[in-house]
Design a protein with these regions (language model features):
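Bacterial N-terminal signal peptides
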Residues: 6-17
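Soluble extramembrane regions of membrane proteins in the secretory/endomembrane system
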Residues: 20-229
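N-terminal secretory signal peptides that target proteins for export/translocation
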Residues: 1-4
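Core alpha-helical transmembrane segments of integral membrane proteins
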Residues: 218-328, 334-337, 344-347
Length: 457
């Protein structure tokens, strides 16, 4: 099997992966939980918790691969024995050596870490540093200790039930189910005995308890349903699969048939990305460019957007051939590296929320990155042709120039909008701080490149 076919097949298997468990936990997926400053479905809470703990969206126990919902539900409802399951991620080899752990392993049990004296000392050191000055920079090992401590706290919160804040209480924070709660007792009984009727009865009791609270403290059922749909859809995974098919089709199938089919795959991927962004906007109530994950996905989207725009004008496959590798690489990175790129939807701090100028500034600047990413792709096509001794047509050079023009235009507008945002927020348009200075330097460098091409004629 070729690497490309293997990659596509793996993506399909990931998209349709069904967690193994005797009970149908679909009803639990849509139960609202308050965590991380917002209300979210249990499905999302479970996925984010397991990613935070293990760096993966699934856990293998006794040779059986378990999805996030069944894993987190088991930690919550049947916690006995989980302290001996390798669940806590430690990725830094030096830190593992420091703790005397097996450097070839990535996951460790709660018990072996909780009883590790060197880890305890490292956590006490970090705590003392933070108590003295919360802004003090930590070294690599101290940062790793802090991260491991956070993961241990996640585990403790799950097995104790403290993290499963399911009940609106009329206050800002929701509460976990009490040990004597009838819904919790039914859920636990049904889960332990694989009794679907008892488990569903527990869910019904829990929904009744949630519905009995004041409406203004409850989660919006429509938003919860939309987020469950989004979480199960994996739109950005499907987008990179379709972009990959588009790029391969354009590369190996010459002629009009290959061009039309490649166009169709790229357009389908683009549209499913649009669906993904619309869903994230509805869920979060803001523009989808507030962290590195969203920025990477947005740049991939913009790269295909500009490629389709130029293809509609020039009818040349070079734009899509240049855009698809960039988009595929970006989306695969976002899809497969959750520890590096956190896909969780977080609420914005008040100073950044509901700020029109900040939103337009960030969207415009990141779209300029997309145009430059397309220029990168087209530029590599030119380099490839030059290396193999193939003639580079003037039209191809012109395509590269056009993509750079779009990037420079958007970068200039975005830089100006950044000044407008600064003036709106802090009362000054330009202050020559490092970020502003380097934004101007980047713009001037690209302007020099564009004008230098004309001067060289």
């Amino acid at each position: 099997m070729t690497p490309i076919r293997h990659l596509v097949l793996s993506a399909f298997l990931l998209a349709f992966c069904v967690p193994a468990h005797a009970l149908d936990l679909t009803g639990l997926e849509a139960i609202p939980v308050q965590e991380g400053g917002r209300k979210k479905p249990f499905l999302v809470f479970a996925d984010e918790s397991l990613l935070s703990l293990t760096g993966k969206s699934a856990h293998t126990k006794d040779g059986i691969k378990l999805g996030p919902v069944v894993t987190v539900a088991s930690l919550w409802l049947t916690p006995v024995g989980w302290e001996d399951q390798p669940l806590v991620l430690i990725g830094n080899k030096k830190f593992k050596d420091h703790l005397g752990l097996d450097p070839s392993k990535k996951l460790f049990t709660y018990r072996e870490l909780a009883t590790n004296e060197k880890l305890r000392a490292a956590l006490q050191e970090v705590s003392a540093i933070r108590a003295k000055n919360p802004k003090t920079s930590l070294d690599t090992l101290q940062r790793e200790a802090s991260t491991v401590g956070m993961r241990l706290a996640v585990f403790e919160g799950l097995v104790s039930g403290r993290s499963d804040t399911l009940l609106p209480t009329g206050a800002a924070a929701w509460s976990p189910l009490g040990s004597g709660d009838s819904a919790l007792a039914k859920l636990r009984e049904g889960f332990m005995s694989d009794d679907q009727a008892t488990f569903d009865a527990g869910l019904a009791l829990l929904r009744g308890e949630q519905a009995g609270q004041e409406p203004r403290f409850q989660a919006d059922p429509g938003k919860i349903a939309i987020e469950v749909f989004y979480q199960n859809l994996h739109p950005f995974r499907w987008a990179w699969i379709l972009y990959l098919l588009a790029g391969v089709t354009l590369l190996v199938l010459p002629g009009r048939a290959g061009y039309v089919l490649g166009w169709a795959f790229a357009l389908a991927g683009f549209l499913i990305q649009v669906v993904g962004f619309v869903l994230r906007i509805v869920i979060s109530g803001r523009a989808p460019v507030t962290n590195m994950y969203e920025s990477v996905v947005w740049v991939a989207f913009g790269t295909i957007l500009f490629a389709l725009f130029f293809e509609a004008i020039y009818r040349s496959r070079y734009f899509l051939l240049g855009a698809t590798p960039v988009a595929v690489a970006s989306l695969i990175l976002a899809d497969t590296q959750p520890v590096i790129l956190d896909s969780a939807i977080h609420p914005l701090v008040p100073v950044l929320a509901d700020n029109f100028w900040l939103t337009t500034h960030v969207l415009t600047i990141t779209l300029s990155y997309a145009a430059f990413a397309l220029a990168l792709g087209v530029g590599h096509i030119i380099l490839g042709k030059t290396i193999i001794g193939s003639k580079v047509s003037p039209a191809l050079n012109n395509y590269l120039y056009r993509t750079l023009q779009i990037g420079v235009l958007l970068l200039a507008i975005g830089t100006i909008l950044g000044g407008v945002w600064a003036n709106y927020s802090w009362g000054r348009f330009w202050d020559w701080d490092p970020k502003e200075t380097w934004a101007l330097i980047a713009l001037l460098a690209y302007l020099f490149l564009l004008h230098g091409r004309v001067a060289g004629k």
